[in-house]
From Swiss-Prot:
Role description: Anchoring protein that mediates the subcellular compartmentation of cAMP-dependent protein kinase (PKA type II). Acts as an anchor for a PKA-signaling complex onto mitotic chromosomes, which is required for maintenance of chromosomes in a condensed form throughout mitosis. Recruits condensin complex subunit NCAPD2 to chromosomes required for chromatin condensation; the function appears to be independent from PKA-anchoring. Specifically involved in recruitment of CAPD2 to, and condensation of maternal but not paternal chromosomes.
Ranges for region Involved in chromatin-binding: 384-447
Chain ranges of zinc fingers (C2H2 AKAP95-type): 389-411, 478-501
Protein name per Swiss-Prot or TrEMBL: A-kinase anchor protein 8
PANTHER family the record matches: A-KINASE ANCHOR PROTEIN 8 (PTHR12190:SF6), A-KINASE ANCHOR PROTEIN AKAP 8 (PTHR12190)
Organism in which the protein naturally occurs: Mus musculus
GO function term, MF aspect, one: NF-kappaB binding
Amino acid sequence: MEQGYGGYGAWSAGPANTQGTYGSGMTSWQGYENYNYYNAQNTSVPAGTPYSYGPASWEATKTNDGGLAAGSPAMHVASFAPEPCTDNSDSLIAKINQRLDMLSKEGGRGGISSGGEGVQDRDSSFRFQPYESYDARPCIPEHNPYRPGYGYDYDFDLGTDRNGSFGGTFNDCRDPAPERGSLDGFLRGRGQGRFQDRSNSSTFIRSDPFMPPSASEPLSTTWNELNYMGGRGLGGPSTSRPPPSLFSQSMAPDYSMMGMQGVGGFGGTMPYGCGRSQTRIRDWPRRRGFERFGPDNMGRKRKQFPLYEEPDAKLARADSDGDLSENDDGAGDLRSGDEEFRGEDDLCDSRKQRGEKEDEDEDVKKRREKQRRRDRMRDRAADRIQFACSVCKFRSFEDEEIQKHLQSKFHKETLRFISTKLPDKTVEFLQEYIINRNKKIEKRRQELLEKESPKPKPDPFKGIGQEHFFKKIEAAHCLACDMLIPAQHQLLQRHLHSVDHNHNRRLAAEQFKKTSLHVAKSVLNNKHIVKMLEKYLKGEDPFVNETADLETEGDENVGEEKEETPEEVAAEVLAEVITAAVKAVEGEGEPAAAHSDVLTEVEGPVDTAEASSDPHTEKLLEEQTCEAASETRSIEDKTRGEAAEARNEAAMPTADAGSTLPVIAIPGIMEDELEQTGAEAKDIPTE
């Protein structure tokens, strides 16, 4: 098969085809030669030649067949065979473009006039069929028929079908009519981009409004027209491939002012192409997106890509920058000096700001600490007159409420949970302790009321008038859901039976049980309550002769252990050492090894005045102290576990300031503290 124009078949110029058809493989239909639209000067065809728009062909009547013979003068355009690169090819291209323009016009006219018949006519008689890219330059050796005819080497992938567009081959300087402008390119784009896949004529893109919709259309009308009306040399995507994404990079090499390739491109034939140099175009990346607002860059700037084939570009640019700075008559040096001074000033300012900020932070910390102390004092004052259940974290100023709580199911379940972790006797002691403490709080409240008249409660609604539309109501605070609910029966019942409340209630109950166990252990660790517990376990009543203050019995630090400062620890250790020394002086006559107490003591009364006045007695006491210290080191492992009891049972020092106090080694005390204590004891003058 002879290579035809654009693969539309063999457009033979021979006389064998008397009807002007394009080949035996195509449906026989009349060409445009005798359409009498552009060729009105041809008088060989009668002016009144009728044409029937049948479903199969554009044929004249039988009586006019002779006028369409091969030898007829009307066939001077019917020869579509490729010729050498002469002027005849340019005129041929111009006439083909004219017929394409006429096709788009007559297609719309026929569709409006004949309705559905126009659709069938165009489907059957439309001459776009499977074709190969036409090469109008056979004189050029080794030409790739699938390569678009641009003036630059743009390696553009047309897909697997290799379906080039109609006018892409002639996008170079071979287009004889660049002055047609944007309208010509628009119409040619409409005529060229109607088929997505030219291998199947059934996938006709119905971009005209009168065409009926088809299930084979993968894209909408707007998307089809926007993508395919500028498809010179690009070809539309076939139906075997998915449509391009709206957010992906453009498959087209460039879109200019109006978004159409036919208006202005790289070819330089259109007024908006701006004649870009070919070398610069080759340096561009293979695929790039839309150029915002054409070559003038009226939109946002696109990032310039580095030229990887020029490794010395950066060095050259750096050298040029250096030359510019050298030729600037010292302006760069002055600028650098100013920048250095400005940097030093900024550094000083930042240091000043940092110092001021640190001072402000210290002031803020001090104010916060003072506020914490005030809040702590206020809370302690409130705790002295507020009823409380420590294990349940229940507090109230009303006697009736605390009594209801102590008899409630919640309180009993909490104690039952604690009894699973602690002995039953200890849990009973906790219950008695809570009841007795609330009784003493009630007595204190009565005393305060007798001394001072009750202060009126401040009105929170003071200063709020009716213009603010406030109303005083009663509400319930759900601790589990952390929600305020108006005290209305319907609202309360609705919340009580809600799914969220029941879920939060179970979670809060479990959390309260765990917290109650921790609080109970914290209360029982207090040294005063430990003594009371011992008495209670012995069967005695620990609440009869209790003189300890209520606030020192562990309720101040509910839920947390009290942290002792190093000074408090050192003072307590010194008190234990002095107490042990006094007991050792009093027990001079007994051997130290015979005792099983926590502290190594020597029992026996010794007159303190005589010991201080007799040097022989003082020497004897020092020897006795050394022997006790050596024996204490030998039994250190045995008595290490009992150091806690020694600290709890140690009493305050009762010895006079003028007496000589020998040092007795205590298990668990550091050696440096012992040496310091011994030095202080030796420095005390004797009377």
